[in-house]
UniProtKB/Swiss-Prot annotation:
It comes from Methanocaldococcus jannaschii (strain ATCC 43067 / DSM 2661 / JAL-1 / JCM 10045 / NBRC 100440) (Methanococcus jannaschii). This is Imidazoleglycerol-phosphate dehydratase. The keyword Amino-acid biosynthesis applies. HAMAP family: HisB. GO terms for cellular component: cytoplasm.
């Protein structure tokens, strides 16, 4: 799961609200061990890992007796911090995906640009799916973009909130897999000669 000469990044974050451990192998095969205390969020992260072919471990303990906001936010922060460690040389840099799931369809485009920006239109019609407050899905992606220093744009349509959310996380995984592909022809893909602020 984490052997060999691979791009593996590890983040630990502990606050008064959460205790998060995250490890991701960008060059993995889609294996995962995820326990955030929020079963539907675990399912979404598993979908991201499986369809992006990332090996992912997430262990999170948060103040769920209050609500799920801090846990979802801080997992997003940790994933962003991990992704920000990716070497921005000899990779595709851009990634995109259009993923259907029955009635739902999600479109995601990302740029590992060294600049943080998130634009999304996921508009849930239900307050919860399982134990996950659907409003926190947008906040998760905002946190990933902010701490990962990447652009994330996404659009979601559909009727079923489970399908909409799952299609979105699958599309994010597929798009990120493309953006992180090694291509030694690329060098640094920027007319500035570097990918950072």
């Amino acid at each position: 799961m984490f052997g060999g000469n691979m791009r593996i990044f590890e983040v630990m974050r502990e606050t008064k609200e959460t205790n998060i451990y995250l490890k991701i192998n960008i060059d993995g095969t889609g294996k995962y061990k995820i326990d955030t205390g929020i079963p539907f969020f675990d399912h979404l992260l598993a979908s991201f890992a499986k369809h992006g072919c990332f090996d992912l471990i997430v262990k999170a303990r948060g103040d769920l007796e209050i609500d799920d906001h801090h846990t979802v936010e801080d997992v997003g922060i940790c994933l962003g911090l991990a992704l920000n460690q990716i070497e921005k040389r000899n990779i595709f840099r851009f990634g995109w995906a259009i993923i259907p799931m029955d009635d739902a369809r999600a479109t995601v485009a990302i740029d590992l640009s060294g600049r943080s920006y998130c634009v999304g239109n996921y508009e849930p019609k239900r307050e919860f799916v399982g134990d996950l407050a659907t409003e926190n899905i947008n906040h998760f992606f905002e946190s990933v973009a902010s701490y990962g220093m990447l652009n994330i744009h996404y659009e979601v349509i559909g009727k079923n909130e489970h399908h909409k959310a799952e299609a979105l996380f699958k599309a994010f995984g597929v798009a990120l897999d493309l953006a992180t592909k090694i291509d030694e022809r690329k060098g640094v893909i920027s007319t500035k000669g570097e990918v950072k602020l």
